[in-house]
Structures are given as C-alpha cells and as structure tokens.
C-alpha cells in the first residue's frame, strides 16, 4: 500500500547504495565506480525518452517528442559534467585502480552503444563485443533492424512532401548513414522558411541539440582520458586518445550540420 512506501523503498536505495564494490583498496575507486554508475542511469533515462520520441516522430506526433528530446539534452549535460568530477582523479590515483579493471572499459557500455545505434551511428561490428551476454547482443541487433531516430525524421520529411530519394528511404538500416544532398536540400528549405515549417524546424534544432551535446560529451571523455592516462592504450584495447579523436569526427545528422553552410 502507498502509505507503506518510504523514500528508500521507492527508490530501492538499499540495492543501489550496495552496488559499489571497490577491489583495489584505493580511496579514489569509489569515485570511479559512482561516476560510471551514475552515467549509466542517465543513459537509461536518455534511452527511455529517445525510444518514445522515435515513436512520436514515426506517428507524426511531434509536440510530445520535443519535450522528450529536450529532456535528453538536459540529461546529456549531466553526463558532460560527470567528466569534471572524474577529472579530479590524478594519474597516480588511476594507476592504483587500473590493474584491477582487466579489459573492462566504458567502450563496452551496452547502453552507450544502444544510444549510438538509436541516433543513427550504426556499425554492426560493435555488437561482437557483447556476444558473451546474449540478451544484450540480441537487443542491439534488434535495434539495428529498426529505423533510427534520424531515419524516422527523414521519413517524416518524405511524408510531408519533401523530395527524399527512394534509395535513402529504402537504405539498409544497419549501415552508417551516408550524407545525401537531397536530404540537405530538404532541410535547407525548412531552414529558409521556418514559419512555414515550424514543427519540422523545431525538430531539426532538437536533433542538433542532441548532436551538439553528444559531441561535447565525447570531447570531455577525450580530454579526461588525456589528462589521466595520457596516450596509453585504453583498457578495452582501443588506441585511447587517438581513437577518441577519430570518434569526434563522426556525426549522427550530417545534413543538419552541412545545411548551415548551404543557407
């Protein structure tokens, strides 16, 4: 019954606060664990909102999606700020923890990968690392078979009468998005006359917000890694900073960036 619910029981705090298990004996390991666990909770919220927003866009019901996408952008700022907390860890602090991490890495976060896939940053090869956990690998493959958030936005443009090529609408969903001049032209028409296409204009700006904050998060990740471990390889086997620099060049919604030059 509701009157029996307490703050702790509703939030399941006993389990949440008992989920930190430092193994190194280092003081800073608690910080390391909590920052990553908190980030996973924010990612869970982002996914919750993005899945719902995608459904709204597919149904041409944009107004609720704007609130959802705005909420994701706010949650992303929390993810970005988490690097400020983690960066209080020095190279010496991290060196006491790293030997206990094995090959575990944030690169292996299934929720991060799901968010990339959902936004449109798709690479089927990234599922392989999750094969030891079949339910996660299955969920990621199922997402690759669905339209991404950006695919749904482009399909909406087509339904609204914009000239989107058939090859764009029928593209393989599990492949990386390839920039389209016709898609850029559609966005350019919207940006040149926002009053005529206000809801699509607002959708475009909400998507740009997501891209902007995601890139800020990636940049924060890069600079935090650079500050703490320099140019060592990552625990997950990546090249560390050089890998993160390469990721910064990847865009989810390329036409929404290039259209700024076009107009």
Curated annotation (Swiss-Prot):
InterPro entries: Trp/Indoleamine_2_3_dOase-like, Trp_2_3_dOase
GO molecular function, one term: heme binding
Pathway stated in the Swiss-Prot or TrEMBL entry: Amino-acid degradation; L-tryptophan degradation via kynurenine pathway; L-kynurenine from L-tryptophan: step 1/2
Binding residue positions for heme: 221
Record's keyword annotation contains Iron: yes
Cofactor: how bound: Binds 1 heme group per subunit.
Catalytic activity field: L-tryptophan + O2 = N-formyl-L-kynurenine
Family to which this protein belongs: Belongs to the tryptophan 2,3-dioxygenase family.
Protein name per Swiss-Prot or TrEMBL: Tryptophan 2,3-dioxygenase
